[in-house]
Amino acid sequence: MRLGVCYFPEHWPSEEWERDVAAMADAGLEYVRMAEFSWGVLEPERGTFDFEWLDEAIELIGDHGMQAVLCTPTATPPKWLVDERPSIRQEDPDGTVREHGSRRHYCFNSDAYREETARIVERVTERYADSPHVAGWQTDNEFGCHETVRCYCDDCADAFRTWLADRYGDIDRLNEAWGNAFWSQQYGSFDEIDPPGPTPAEHHPSRLLAYARFSSDSVVEYNRLHADLIREADPDWFVTHNFMGRFPTLNAYDVSEDLDRVAWDSYPTGFVQDRYDGEASPDQLRAGDPDQVGMDHDIYRSALDRPFWVMEQQPGDVNWPPHCPQPGEGAMRLWAHHAAAHGADAVLYFRWRRCLEGQEQYHAGLRKADGSPDRGYADAAHTSEEFATLDGASHVDAPVAVVFDYDSLWALNAQPHAPDFDYWALQEAFYGAVRGRGVQVDVVPPSADLSGYAAVVAPALHLVTEDLADRLTDYIAGGGEVLFGPRTGVKDAENKLRPMSQPGPLTDLVGATVDQHESLPRRLETTVRRVGDPTDDSEEIAAPPVSFRTWAEWLDPDAAEPQYAYDVDGPADGRPAVVTNTVGDGQVTYCGVWPESDLADALASDLLDRAGVRYAERLPDGVRIGYRGGRTWVTNFTSDRLRLPEIDPESLAVDDTDRDGFDPMADDDKDSSADGIVVGPYGVAVIEGDCVDGLRIAQT
């Protein structure tokens, strides 16, 4: 496990580089990413190249025992190129052109831009093919950032028609597959089909799904262009890309097929503000949500089933969310350890030094604008010392898979049927319940081989093919345990309802059908009660009902046994909401509601019990554990102190006792005879051995 940083030598006088790079080495950093936005500096005018500054920076990094990770500089085409070839610019659905003046203003389907991309990538990779100090390359930067996966220009229109022709073969097949008889939307040829622009009413959902798939595929092709050229220059380099958090428009699994390792950019306190389901708590505003960040860690680790990188780790306050609270003391260390617990090989902080100009002046670095240490520098230096005491990176062995399906995400985004129905948030509800029991999770696409998992959670497989239904049936019949969420098996691969009861091809497997569904505003009572539990009018103590939200399905069991029934003042009262069916040697549970935390935890623990997966007592909110490489990580995303009474202090590989300002015996914890260990606010403990199912955590 290694640390690094993102550096922009082109922003600073060259006489300051030595001081900067020496301070990086002093902090124990090992990788330095550079040049992702440097095209205008590398080629200030067509055909005139200036590599001397980058040559010097790379050499300096190597002289200090570090390695450079270079980037193809295509995220920021220079002004002279935009003026020469204006057709490279993206267009919005209404025809508005995205002008020069920020970044990511190019179209992935522009033949002109692909030509220019090949030219600059060939030139920079050839330049450094023999450098011993360049470890690998990042392709471009954050594909799709600023809502740029989907473009609607003439080049995209032509490419979309070609993509459709390749997929469907003839126009009659497309019309039938989409169901274009609705509202007279039939096409006479592929040439008649345009990208979905402004319309009086909503677009055809099958057309929207097709455009989402096409747009993602366009990025896959563009990334492959970079990867092929990088490997042609030097096959020993690794190729990666820095994806983004909770990012819905790009299929990361498809892009990753052309990468050697997957990376992503993690900004926890920003994510809980601009892409979070609900209002962030004070602790989350200081440290983020471990499950929101953790699910992205697990998506990107699982994409290639190998250790991943965090290419940009938040170093302090950031400039782009609505507010920029300072992270909690030690949070920058916490985030690096949290990534390591989820399988990260390397964590690079963004950025080295707060910049003096441009759009990111209010984005912190590890160093302040004057070059002096900022808050994150001490955290980074401390973490590098701790990482050096831990063995090299190892594989994360996850007994549970969560199935994440971009096609279903796009289909549900087209027809959410409730203003707060968010596919990603629904995934996190189920994912968080498993992680809340300390169990490691792979987040995999529907095409993944599930045979190695003890249990599978599929929160919203909205689009289900016959092949997928058969594979799931075989998995369960062979002894697998599956938990489905609501809106599963509803549509075919083209985003059309089937002429059969839901959950469609999964009906026999589930052993029940969906009679009715409803989307519910928050003000309606939304609770269910476990079947067989005492009720309020019985002589026994009544078990409290548990809550759900947003979505409800009334289930009609056939072979399945009801597990939970609605406990509401309404027409669903008493109807089954959750059922379980036995198929061969395994079982499947279908949950017809969006579960709140107590119900999600109950479903997860039931699943883990049936699958024989060891798990912890339910963890406090904001506290997570993870097992990797013979060690257990405890990460505390809260301002509370944690006591772990069963843990022998001698078993600690990393703890909080060396943190500046932390006293493990402070305040109400001064009893030196107390058993166990203490983890401080926003703190970390790494324990030798696997203690997941024997761990008890108390907040103090």
Swiss-Prot record:
Composition-biased stretches (Acidic residues): 648-658
Pfam families: Glyco_hydro_42 (PF02449), Glyco_hydro_42M (PF08532)
GO terms for cellular component: beta-galactosidase complex
Activation/inhibition comment: Requires 4 M NaCl or KCl for maximal activity.
Active-site residues (renumbered): E142, E312
Role noted for this protein: Cleaves o-nitrophenyl-beta-D-galactopyranoside (ONPG) in vitro.
Full protein name: Beta-galactosidase Bga
Organism (species): Halorubrum lacusprofundi (strain ATCC 49239 / DSM 5036 / JCM 8891 / ACAM 34)
